[in-house]
Amino acid sequence: MNWQLLARANTHPLRISILEVLAIDDGRTLSPNELSQELRTPLSNVNYHVVQLLNSGLVELAGEHPVRGATEHFYRLPALSPAEA
């Protein structure tokens, strides 16, 4: 694990909140839109930070769903390997 990336990814309070929401109930799968509503934060801000978490490996793409000519993406926390658990 790249600890520098992990530390940098967790320096923003919104990223921590996103990770906390995704961790509820042993892991949830949510779209940035759903996270935005739950966190009462603008979608553009949530989407930016979800992409940063995705790039750092702290969340993973769980699926896609077509919505009105666009594609809604859903994210979750990656599963821990037995060595990490």
Question: What is each residue range found by the language model?
Answer:
Residues 6-14, 31, 62-85:
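Short, cationic-aromatic polyanion-contact patches
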Residues 23-27:
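Short helix-capping/hinge SLiMs at alpha-helix to coil transitions
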Residues 34-37:
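A short acidic, leucine-rich amphipathic alpha-helix
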Residues 57-58:
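Glycine-centered, phosphate/nucleic-acid-interacting loop/turn motifs that mediate DNA/RNA or nucleotide
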